[in-house]
Amino acid sequence: AVSLVLPQLK
């Protein structure tokens, strides 16, 4: 789940 959010912020 977290892996999906971090790339979106980048």
UniProtKB/Swiss-Prot annotation:
Keywords recorded for this protein, A-Z: NADP, Oxidoreductase
Q: What is its EC number?
A: 1.2.1.13
Q: What class of enzyme is it?
A: oxidoreductase
Query: What domain of life is recorded for the organism?
Result: Eukaryota
Q: Which reaction does it catalyse?
A: D-glyceraldehyde 3-phosphate + phosphate + NADP(+) = (2R)-3-phospho-glyceroyl phosphate + NADPH + H(+)
Tell me yes or no: is Oxidoreductase among this UniProt entry's keywords.
yes
An example molecular function term from Gene Ontology annotations = glyceraldehyde-3-phosphate dehydrogenase (NADP+) (phosphorylating) activity
Looking at the UniProt entry, the stretches that span the membrane are none
Kindly state the subunit structure of this protein. Answer: Tetramer of either four A chains (GAPDH 2) or two A and two B chains (GAPDH 1).
The family annotation for this protein states: Belongs to the glyceraldehyde-3-phosphate dehydrogenase family.
List the protein's name: Glyceraldehyde-3-phosphate dehydrogenase B
